[in-house]
A protein has these predicted regions:
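A cross-family phosphate/adenosyl-ligand binding-site feature
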Residues: 1-48, 53-116
Length: 116
């Protein structure tokens, strides 16, 4: 996973700490996690960051903006008000389901909205 020749097509880092966000933006590759992110960026593969630790500071948002401009998908673990989740498991399933959607992985973790 830490080499472009390994052939990873999609990478998700979730949860992604603010420290990891800053390191990814700065190009650090000093750990396996940072190296996997660096490889995804250099190979122009899909990279999704489930950034946590809100509220976000201006500096955090600038890191997210720059990474987004580089093609990274910023997908914080935030529950949508329309999800109608009534317990913690449903909330978790909604967030995980949204990440799986971004990865192109089918699932049935939450009920999809139906346009009647």
């Amino acid at each position: 996973v830490a080499s472009g020749s390994f052939g990873i097509e999609k990478t998700i880092i979730a949860p992604c700490s603010i420290s990891s966000l800053a390191k990814i933006h700065a190009g650090f590759a000093d750990t396996l996690l940072m190296r996997a992110a660096a490889v995804a960026l250099k190979e122009r593969k899909k990279l999704i960051l489930g950034v946590r630790e809100m509220p976000f500071s201006t500096l955090n948002l600038e890191h997210m903006l720059k990474l987004s401009q580089m093609g990274v998908i910023i997908a914080p673990p935030i529950i949508a008000s329309y999800s109608h989740a009534s317990n913690l498991e449903q909330m978790e399933n909604f967030i995980i389901g949204k990440w799986l959607d971004l990865l192109g992985i089918s699932h049935n973790l939450y009920e999809r909205w139906q346009n009647f």
